[in-house]
């Protein structure tokens, strides 16, 4: 079956993912990237950046919850959180569900992502006015370089793929700066693409770079994300000075807020490592 121009299609490494469109709502070229917004038949509103699906109404909750709750429940007392990227503000919303968080700073280089999210994905921006939230539109790499040593408990890197503006967020030099900015027991989590498509090209080099930078331990979280290439995604957690563990498992069992995907059992399951993946990462 061939698809006509009523479909949006993302082509990635000899695979394709398509959604039938109702209409294109917006398109613009910012100084950093091309952003498109569509209304689809089955997945609600869709945001596309440089031809790649960033989020849809239907499944963004999985990604945002897995980028925030596992790492926060793996830290003993996550008061100060930095989000790099995350311009759609969904991860920020999830972070601010945690009463322990006293400060959540989001640094995204492209303000237009946030302004378009406010218009087309307003439910993701519910917490933008929370007094604990601070939204900055700047270079996240430089922000980390300038951060006071030991000032952060958790760094969440909610970036696009490792090309263009996000490429430097996957470098050993950047990870060294993250270690400096993190306090004792400090944790980093970063979206790390698909195990089926990117283990050799992205995930293994990322884990190697994190350890080369000085992180003591790394751990991959696995979760479904059907609108992303292969439908199977990961987030990589790293701790600067101790093993990555589910430190506050009891609190996660009795979390004081609503989620749609995440719970303590999901976190326990997400760290299970498929055999092919384990062999490639750890030999």
UniProtKB/Swiss-Prot annotation:
Protein's UniProt name: Polyamine aminopropyltransferase
Residue stretches making up the PABS domain: 5-240
GO biological process, one term: spermidine biosynthetic process
Record localization: Cytoplasm
Entry keyword annotation includes Cytoplasm: yes
InterPro entries, per database record: PABS, PABS_CS, SAM-dependent_MTases_sf, Spermi_synthase, Spermidine_synt_N, Spermidine_synt_N_sf
Record keywords: Cytoplasm, Polyamine biosynthesis, Spermidine biosynthesis, Transferase
Gene3D superfamilies (UniProt xref): Spermidine synthase, tetramerisation domain, Vaccinia Virus protein VP39
Residue numbers binding spermidine: 64, 88, 158-161
EC number(s) stated in the UniProt entry for this protein: 2.5.1.16
Quaternary organization: Homodimer or homotetramer.
Origin superkingdom: Bacteria
Record-stated family: Belongs to the spermidine/spermine synthase family.
Primary subcellular site in the record, as a coarse category: cytoplasm
Pathway the protein contributes to: Amine and polyamine biosynthesis; spermidine biosynthesis; spermidine from putrescine: step 1/1
A Pfam family annotated for this UniProt entry: Spermine_synth
GO-annotated cellular components: cytosol
Name of the gene: speE
Binding site residues for S-methyl-5'-thioadenosine: 33, 108, 139-140, 165
A molecular function GO annotation: spermidine synthase activity
Known catalytic reactions: S-adenosyl 3-(methylsulfanyl)propylamine + putrescine = S-methyl-5'-thioadenosine + spermidine + H(+)
């Amino acid at each position: 079956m061939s698809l006509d121009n009523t479909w949006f299609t993302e082509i990635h490494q000899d695979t394709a993912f398509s959604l039938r469109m109702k209409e294109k709502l917006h398109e613009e070229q910012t100084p950093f990237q091309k952003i498109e917004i569509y209304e689809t038949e089955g997945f609600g509103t869709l945001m596309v950046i440089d031809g790649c699906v960033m989020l849809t109404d239907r499944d963004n909750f999985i990604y945002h919850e897995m980028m925030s709750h596992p790492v926060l429940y793996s830290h003993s007392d996550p008061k100060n959180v930095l989000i790099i990227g995350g311009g759609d503000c969904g991860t920020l919303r999830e972070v601010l569900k945690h009463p322990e968080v006293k400060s959540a700073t989001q640094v995204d280089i492209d303000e237009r992502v946030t302004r378009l999210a406010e218009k087309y994905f307003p439910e993701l921006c519910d917490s933008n006015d929370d007094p604990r939230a601070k939204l900055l539109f700047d270079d996240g790499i430089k922000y980390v370089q300038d951060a006071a040593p030991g000032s952060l408990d958790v760094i969440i890197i909610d970036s696009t793929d490792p090309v263009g503006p996000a490429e430097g967020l996957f470098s050993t030099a950047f990870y060294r700066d993250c270690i400096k900015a993190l306090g004792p027991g400090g944790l980093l989590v970063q979206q790390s693409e698909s195990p089926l498509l990117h283990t050799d090209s992205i995930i293994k080099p990322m884990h190697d770079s994190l350890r080369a930078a000085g992180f003591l331990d790394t751990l991959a979280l696995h979760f479904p994300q059907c609108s992303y290439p292969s439908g199977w995604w990961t987030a990589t957690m790293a701790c600067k000075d101790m093993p990555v563990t589910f430190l506050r498992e009891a609190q996660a069992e009795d979390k004081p807020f609503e989620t749609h995907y995440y719970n303590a059992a999901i976190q326990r399951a997400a760290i299970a490592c498929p055999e092919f993946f384990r062999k490639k990462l750890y030999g």
